Amino acid sequence: MNALPLGTVPPQKSLIAIPAWNEAGSIASVVASVQEHRPDADILVVNDGSTDLTAQEAQKAGARVVSLPFNVGVGGAMRTAFLYAQREGYQALVQVDADGQHDPADLDRLLEGLADSDIVVGTRFHPESMYFVGGPRRWAMVLLSKALSWMNKGTISDPTSGFRSAGPKAIELFAIEYPADYLGDTVGSLSIAIRQGLVIHEAPVTMYFRQVGRPSKNALWSALYLGRATLAILATGLKANRTPREDAS
């Protein structure tokens, strides 16, 4: 792993973290759009073992780049970003996808939400949204949303959203404990945060379909994984909510 660049970060300084794997075709435009909407923020691209020119394109666009020696997945890349944020003293971190799905115009909303939250999840499912997910994946997402919302005692309508912000408590937690498996950066991290008592809210955001490339998993595989994740979360939630009498029986 490359050495992480060091520097002095003023209090409340925000870090925009962009995990990227073979996103040379879109990373420069994503970095430029983030710079346009949040010129005060630092941008860190975690180059996740790319075999194309992702790192070079990100550097030319003005981002700081940390290159991992091989592909570890979004969870591993974001763990690196949280470690960087913790070490450099950032008070806020926003995860943005490298494929152009997330609209940097919503960065302000996600950062402002940290005033009364530890994590703010950007949801694409709101009345003004034109984003559509159908079929088995949508059914699995609905079930997962209900399970996480029950555990959270507050609505999480878009649990697989990777467009989210994290405050100081979440940065400290995720620098130590962050799942690296598929969707660990979304579903798994929320489950961990809920169990640790972090305050999670959501905010409406705009999301688009990928600019270039294709998803790493197909819709059916994702639906099956989400269904399994829902069962695991429900089992964890039921265990955590047992009374001492029930545990003794």
Language-model segments: residues:
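Acceptor/aglycone-binding surface of glycosyltransferases and processive sugar-polymer synthases
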Residues: 68-87, 104-183, 209-227, 242-249
